[in-house]
From Swiss-Prot:
Keywords: Amino-acid biosynthesis, Aromatic amino acid biosynthesis, Lyase, Tryptophan biosynthesis. Pathway: Amino-acid biosynthesis; L-tryptophan biosynthesis; L-tryptophan from chorismate: step 5/5. This is Tryptophan synthase alpha chain. Gene3D superfamilies: Aldolase class I (3.20.20.70). GO terms for molecular function: tryptophan synthase activity. The keyword Cell wall biogenesis/degradation does not apply. The keyword RNA-binding does not apply. Tetramer of two alpha and two beta chains. It comes from Thermoanaerobacter sp. (strain X514). The gene is trpA. The active site is at residues 49, 60. Belongs to the TrpA family.
C-alpha cells in the first residue's frame, strides 16, 4: 500500500486531519533540507511536499519563487535531491511527494525521473503545469512504478474537476484561491461550496492549500477537508536567516501549532 493511502487511513481512524507541509528542496542548502524534513516529521507533519526548484514556477508567489531561486543559485539539481531523499529514507517512512514542474521532468526524461523517484522512495507527484492532454504519458509510467499522480483542482475548474480527478491518486490538492501561492490573511472563496463540488466527483481525500498561514486559518478550514497544506508561511520561516538551530526550532514550533488544531 502506498504510504499516502496508509497515512490517510491512520488519520481517519484517529479522527484527525492531515498536516501536509511544503518546502523547497535545496533551500537554504541540500543538507539542511534533510534536517528540515526530520524536524517537520518530529513536529507532527503527516506528509511532506518537496519542491524541485525551477526557474519559472508559474503557480508560485514571490516567497516560493525566491526560495526556488536560492536553491538554483546554490546549484541544486534533481540528482542532488534524489540523493537527499534516499538519505531521508534511511531515517524516516513519512510520505514524500515531489512538487515538480512538467518541463523539469520532461528535460530529465520521464521514465528516468519516475524510476529514480521510485528507487529513492518518493510516493507521489504534484505537477502544477501538467496539461490534461499530456497526462497520459506520465500516468502510464507513474502507475508502472507505483507513484501517485496527485490531482490539483481550483475553484474555477468546476466542469474540469471530474476530468482532473478521475485518474488521480492519493489525495486531491484543492487550491483554495485563484492565483499564485503565498501566505494570506484570509481566504475568500466559499470553501464549503467548493469542497462539496469536489466531493461530487471524487471519493479521494481532499486537502486544501494555497494561502494558509496561521493555526486559526487551518482550524477554520479543517472541517471542510481531510487535510491542510502549508507552504509559503513555512518557507518564509526557513528564509528568515536565523542560524540553523534557531531556524529548525522556529519551524518545529510553527508546525506543532498547526498540528494542535487539526
Amino acid at each position: 500500500m502506498n504510504r499516502i493511502d496508509k497515512k490517510f487511513e491512520v488519520l481517519k481512524g484517529e479522527g484527525r486531519k492531515a498536516l501536509i507541509t511544503f518546502i523547497t528542496a535545496g533551500d537554504p542548502d541540500i543538507e539542511t533540507t534533510y534536517d528540515i524534513v526530520l524536524a517537520l516529521e518530529e513536529a507532527g507533519s503527516d506528509i511532506i511536499e518537496l519542491g524541485i526548484p525551477y526557474s519559472d514556477p508559474l503557480a508560485d508567489g514571490p516567497t516560493i519563487q525566491a526560495s526556488s531561486q536560492r536553491a538554483l543559485n546554490k546549484g541544486v539539481k534533481i540528482p542532488d535531491i534524489m540523493k537527499i531523499v534516499e538519505k531521508i529514507r534511511l531515517k524516516s517512512d513519512i510520505p514524500l511527494v515531489y512538487l515538480v514542474y512538467y518541463n523539469s521532468i520532461f528535460k530529465y526524461g520521464i521514465q528516468k525521473f519516475l524510476k529514480e523517484s521510485k528507487d529513492v522512495g518518493i510516493d507521489g507527484l504534484i505537477i502544477p503545469d501538467l496539461p490534461i492532454e499530456e497526462r497520459k504519458d506520465i500516468l502510464e509510467e507513474a502507475d508502472k512504478y507505483g507513484i501517485y499522480l496527485i490531482p490539483l483542482v481550483a475553484p474555477t475548474s468546476k466542469e474540469r474537476i471530474k476530468l482532473i480527478t478521475e485518474n488521480g491518486k492519493g489525495f486531491v490538492y484543492c487550491v483554495s484561491i485563484t492565483g499564485v501561492t503565498g501566505a494570506r490573511e484570509d481566504i475568500e472563496t466559499d470553501i464549503e461550496e467548493y469542497m462539496k463540488t469536489v466531493s461530487q466527483y471524487t471519493n479521494m481525500p481532499k486537502a486544501i492549500g494555497f494561502g494558509i498561514s496561521t493555526p486559526e486559518m487551518a482550524k477554520k478550514l479543517k472541517d471542510f477537508s481531510d487535510g491542510i497544506i502549508v507552504g509559503s508561511a513555512l518557507v518564509e520561516r526557513i528564509a528568515k536567516g536565523y542560524n540553523k538551530s534557531e531556524m529548525l526550532q522556529e519551524v518545529k514550533s510553527f508546525v506543532s501549532s498547526l498540528k494542535e488544531v487539526l
